[in-house]
Structures are given as C-alpha cells and as structure tokens.
C-alpha cells in the first residue's frame, strides 16, 4: 500500500480536501506568476490550525475566523531593497511575497490564538534580521517568530530544536 502524496501542482487539488491520520488538509490557490500553486490549511489532530503559504505573490484568503495557531509563510524580499534594473526583478516581484505582503497578511489574520510564525524562502541577500524584527513587531512578543533554516525542525509549541 502506497502513501498518498499531496502535490501542489495538480490542478484538481485546489477543490479537494483530504485526511491523513488525524490531519485534515484543504488546498487553495495561491498566485505565483501564472504558475499553478497551492497553499494548505491544515487542522491538526489536537485541533490546532496551521497554514502553509509559499511561492506566492500574496494570499487573497482570510483565515481570521479559523483562528490560526501556526503560520509558515514565505518572506522573500524587502521591496525597497530590490533593484528594478536587475534581470530577475519581475520574477521576484510577481512570484514571491515581500515583507510588506507578509505583514499585511499577518495583520489581517492575527488573533490571540496565534502562537507561531515561521518565515521561509528568504532571498539569500536579504536582511533576515530586519524581517524577523518587523514580523515580531506585527504579531507581538507572545508569538514565536523564526526564520526557517535548512534541516531545522520546529515544534509548534513555541520551541525550536535546541531551545529546550
């Protein structure tokens, strides 16, 4: 018996939800420069709610009523740091979320239930310290905010591996 895999590039997925053990997963469209892309709303076995948002220009959906506990979201660049003359400028702007987009999403979706924000897919040349500071200012001191690192594991209880 195989393991079913949810892949973000199958067009029929956007209209589907699935269960994996105690996890309930709902896929939704995310704009990514004309390429099919999906985010995921996940209800975990303990009832907590999680969104996965990456490779996107923005998220047009609002999850305030779902009272998110955990958010993994792309924070690729800071708008004013982009060079409009650079060859990749259009690709970056049309296909990836800026710090401003992330802060707008977090402001629109913040509730007192939010516990964790993990930023991912940052441009290697960006000021990730600034990204972390500004997101922390947006969501408040009670919310754990991390920049995803390669091979790191994160527990969704405000602790990162090694923080215990």
Which residues make up each language-model segment?
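Core dinuclear metal-dependent hydrolase active-site scaffold
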Residues: 10-66, 70, 152-164
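A structural signal for isolated positions on well-ordered beta-strands in alpha/beta enzyme cores
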Residues: 4-6, 51, 116-118
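A generic structural signal for alpha->beta connector loops
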Residues: 2, 22, 47, 114, ...
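Histidine-centered divalent metal-coordination motifs
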Residues: 1, 32, 121
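Cap/insert and terminal regions of metallo-dependent hydrolase folds
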Residues: 61-151
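Structural motif
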Residues: 8, 53-55, 120-124
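A structural preference for short, hydrophobic beta-strand core positions in alpha/beta folds
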Residues: 7, 27, 145-147
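Active-site metal-binding motif and surrounding structural segment of the metallo-beta-lactamase
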Residues: 1-7, 69
């Amino acid at each position: 018996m195989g393991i079913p895999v949810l892949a973000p590039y199958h067009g029929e997925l956007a209209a589907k939800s699935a269960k994996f053990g105690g996890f309930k997963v709902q896929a939704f469209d995310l704009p990514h420069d004309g390429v099919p892309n999906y985010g995921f709303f996940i209800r975990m076995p303990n009832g907590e709610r999680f969104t996965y948002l990456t490779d996107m220009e923005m998220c047009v959906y609002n999850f305030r009523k779902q009272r998110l506990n955990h958010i993994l979201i792309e924070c690729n660049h800071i708008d004013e740091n982009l060079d409009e003359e650079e060859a990749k400028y259009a690709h970056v702007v049309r296909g990836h979320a800026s710090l401003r987009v992330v802060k707008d999403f977090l402001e629109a979706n913040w509730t007192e239930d939010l516990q964790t924000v993990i930023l991912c897919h940052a441009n290697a040349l960006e000021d990730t310290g600034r990204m972390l500071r500004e997101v922390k200012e947006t969501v408040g001191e009670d919310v754990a905010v991390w920049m995803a690192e390669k091979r790191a594991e994160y527990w969704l209880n405000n602790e990162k591996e090694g923080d215990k």
